[in-house]
Swiss-Prot record:
Species, as recorded: Mycobacteroides abscessus (strain ATCC 19977 / DSM 44196 / CCUG 20993 / CIP 104536 / JCM 13569 / NCTC 13031 / TMC 1543 / L948) (Mycobacterium abscessus)
Enzyme class, spelled out: transferase
Reactions it catalyzes: (R)-pantothenate + ATP = (R)-4'-phosphopantothenate + ADP + H(+)
Cystine pairs: none
GO molecular function, one term: pantothenate kinase activity
HAMAP family found in the cross-reference section: Pantothen_kinase_1
Family (UniProt): Belongs to the prokaryotic pantothenate kinase family.
EC number: 2.7.1.33
The protein's name in its UniProt record: Pantothenate kinase
């Protein structure tokens, strides 16, 4: 049985307890598809998909169905017997740099889109709502890129509000990690999805006014020991010397020729001056707001989960 922490709004599971909740949900991903979803340095395999992500997809599927029934009941109360469209179900995925939240979001998108009841599943990252580099420089906050103030939070809130309100077409800016900037004149078009997954560092933040987290129907925080995340970040940084950094167009091309020692020192400097302070000050404090916390071990595997009951 899962462990109840009394008094607590959460119920905790180990992996064996959680995987039993998959029931008969079929595994619909292939190894080839999973390779395309797996982020650099991530170790996720089909066993983890079956034991962790399929129960999660089943839970969300049940909640989407319940939310659709609630929407229909409200429409009946209002006398609207033929509502134009159901309200999109919005999922937030948060966590530190290098913790694997992008892989979590992509795998979840692939699984949820297999259900006939909600085949249209869109994934948007908040990177697109970073201010362009020129604006960050104008505000003298280029060194704070990734911190809450570096995002166009009003634009992000407006985007999610319009999607949630059923707008036929909503656009989001597109960010290039290669160029380290917003791509001019390029947009991500979202057209009335059944489910919208919003992935980013700070999506669970709260404030004195309406925040994007207030519009979530379900939220996930990908968690791990800080020491492990730092090591994953450094390992990824070193690996990128022969992948994205090697591209002459990359903003970080100057890192491509660094030795292991030089690259490790550079990664540690970035981690301790930017990523760690942002994690401690802004990201980690939002963890209690998540509907579900996925806890990773040092080998990247998810072995503990904490689900909010209320």
């Amino acid at each position: 049985m899962p462990r109840l922490s009394e008094p607590s709004p959460y119920v905790e599971f180990d992996r064996k307890q959680w995987r039993a909740l998959r029931k008969s949900t079929p595994l619909v991903l292939t190894e080839e598809e999973l390779i395309g979803l797996r982020g650099l340095g991530e170790q996720i395999d089909l066993t983890e998909v079956a034991e962790v992500y399929l129960p999660l997809a089943r839970l969300i599927h049940l909640q989407v169905a319940a939310r659709q029934r609630l929407f229909a009941a409200t429409a009946t109360f209002l006398g609207d017997q033929h509502p134009d469209r159901l309200v999109p179900f919005v999922i937030g995925v948060a966590g530190s740099v290098a913790v694997g939240k992008s892989t979590t979001a992509r795998v979840l998108q692939a699984l949820l889109a297999r259900w006939d009841h909600h085949p249209r599943v869109d994934l948007v990252t908040t990177d697109g709502f970073l201010y362009p580099n020129a604006e960050l420089s104008r505000r003298n906050i280029m060194h704070r890129k990734g911190f809450p103030e570096s995002y166009n939070r009003r634009g992000l809130l407006r985007f999610v509000t319009e999607v949630k309100s059923g707008a036929r077409e909503v656009t989001a800016p597109v960010y290039s990690h290669l160029l380290y900037d917003i791509i001019k004149n390029e947009k991500h078009v979202v057209q009335q999805p059944d489910i919208l997954i919003l992935e980013g560092l700070n999506v669970l933040q709260t404030g004195p006014t309406l925040m994007v987290s207030d519009l979530f129907d379900f939220s996930i925080y990908v968690d791990a020991r800080i020491e492990d995340i730092e090591q994953w970040y450094i390992s990824r940084f070193l690996a990128m010397r022969s992948t994205s950094f090697a591209n002459p167009s990359s903003h970080f091309h100057h890192y491509a020729k660094l030795s292991d020692k030089q690259a490790t020192l550079a990664a540690q400097e970035i981690w301790h001056s930017i990523n760690l302070p942002n994690l401690l000050e802004n990201i980690l404090p939002t963890r209690p707001r998540a509907t579900l916390v996925l806890r990773k071990d040092a080998d990247h595997s998810i072995n503990r989960l904490r689900l909010r009951k209320l």
